């Protein structure tokens, strides 16, 4: 059997750490990538097509899109949905970065053997605990794994192990190097968080220079200076970093409007009466998205969960939904094309008269409102084809 490796990613944005991960993998690589909305409840800095192009330029062979109802989920559900898509495409291996050196295949075997017992353990825990707390207690109890509170990729890797249990998928953990959630650009591999912050700082500076230039003389707008980040981004995609971008600031007025006017927030996915009341009260005084999160979260409702809930509200995700049967292709190389040829009937390459996933397509329409320079995200868009050199 040919080795085909799956990777679950956001690439928000793609950086040298991601390039390093891809370079550690032999053979064809399929990336199941979040679309325009991220797992932690935020819009992607660059749209899905831009990020797919980055991935293909740096070694991915096939990039497929996670529907929004998979991409914006807690770790277990995010992992489960993504692994199912990759397994459907025929992967033999799943590669991911982790801060830990444990054997995740062994963890998957333990979960496969004790799944019923482990899930019962979670259900028996006190209701006031958050789901991440319950999950960590489960892993500690059944495997002895310890958590130090600063291993987000390890937590996600455990979710991958759980999702891959019993599916005959070999788990390949690649040791992560660098501070992957640092907010500062440092030597070595910079985090996606640091790159996002730096990019918005550079964009604000460019906009200010453009404004000042227009006030003095009629000249061309200032160009985005990417020199500050060039050491942290693969050179082949550096220019792509000048693409249109967005963040929650662009959508906050829309979110305020939705929360204030919708009298039935409880109809939204995972929103209950208690949260509805908290949101209605908090939105009256919150001046921005981060303030709203701070006002709503509690020990039980973590910040990550609140950010996802706010995303569901903005995107109008209902309580009940079905996942799409077909897999949407964003781009491929020659090797990726060979994988697609083996999966005819499972894929959709162009969204037109035939829809793919209504909720994702509507979510993309809202995403487009975040920057006037964003292009149409679905209708008529064809997969990116990586030309071989």
UniProtKB/Swiss-Prot annotation:
Q: What is its main location?
A: cytoplasm
Reaction(s) catalysed (UniProt annotation): cytidine(34) in elongator tRNA(Met) + acetate + ATP = N(4)-acetylcytidine(34) in elongator tRNA(Met) + AMP + diphosphate
What one GO molecular function would you report for this record? Answer: ligase activity, forming carbon-nitrogen bonds
Gene Ontology cellular component terms for the protein in this record: cytoplasm
Residues bound to ATP: 8-21, 97, 153, 176
EC number annotated for this UniProt entry: 6.3.4.-
Q: Name one GO biological process term.
A: tRNA modification
Q: Which keywords are on file for this protein?
A: ATP-binding, Cytoplasm, Ligase, Nucleotide-binding, RNA-binding, tRNA processing, tRNA-binding
Q: Where in the cell is it found?
A: Cytoplasm
Q: Which Pfam families match?
A: HIGH_NTase1
This molecule's function is given as: Catalyzes the formation of N(4)-acetylcytidine (ac(4)C) at the wobble position of elongator tRNA(Met), using acetate and ATP as substrates. First activates an acetate ion to form acetyladenylate (Ac-AMP) and then transfers the acetyl group to tRNA to form ac(4)C34.
State the PANTHER family in the record: TRNA(MET) CYTIDINE ACETATE LIGASE
What family does the database annotate? Answer: Belongs to the TmcAL family.
Give the matching HAMAP family.
Answer: TmcAL (MF_01539)
Name of this protein: tRNA(Met) cytidine acetate ligase
